[in-house]
Amino acid sequence: MEQLVYIALLGALGCLCRYFLSGLVYQVFGTSFPYGTLAVNLIGAFLIGLVMEFSVRSAAIPPTLRFAITIGFLGGLTTFSTFSFETFRLLEDGALLIAFVNVLVSVVACLTCTWIGIMVARAL
């Protein structure tokens, strides 16, 4: 039960971070492209690579904390559903190129960020 509380608390924190970070990114870059969603997903992809690799190589992050961070915080921070919805809206609006770029950049950049997180964890 304690584990669920940690996941819920960090999940709520992740959701709040997503709300404020994506909002800030949209204020800076505008809404012509899903920049805010991309930004939080890139951050989350980097962090999951870092946390998971570091926790595999070290006992510094106990499983309870690892689950709270990855399932809770990063689950709240990142959003595949919003990515899907925004991409669908772009397709629906006829912005096929922007939708394609969103999918391509999101997948390639998130995988790259995860890899960078893993490499950083290995260097620590």
Curated annotation (Swiss-Prot):
Keyword Magnesium: no
Subcellular location: Cell inner membrane
Domain of life: Bacteria
Binding site for Na(+): 75, 78
Keywords: Cell inner membrane, Cell membrane, Ion channel, Ion transport, Membrane, Metal-binding, Sodium, Transmembrane, Transmembrane helix, Transport
Gene Ontology CC, one term: plasma membrane
Stated regulation of activity: Na(+) is not transported, but it plays an essential structural role and its presence is essential for fluoride channel function.
Primary site of residence: membrane
One example GO MF annotation: fluoride channel activity
Topological category with respect to the lipid bilayer: Multi-pass membrane protein
Transmembrane segments: 5-25, 32-52, 67-87, 96-116
Reactions it catalyzes: fluoride(in) = fluoride(out)
Annotated GO biological process: cellular detoxification of fluoride
Primary role: Fluoride-specific ion channel. Important for reducing fluoride concentration in the cell, thus reducing its toxicity.
HAMAP family, per the entry: FluC
UniProt family annotation: Belongs to the fluoride channel Fluc/FEX (TC 1.A.43) family.
Record protein name field: Fluoride-specific ion channel FluC
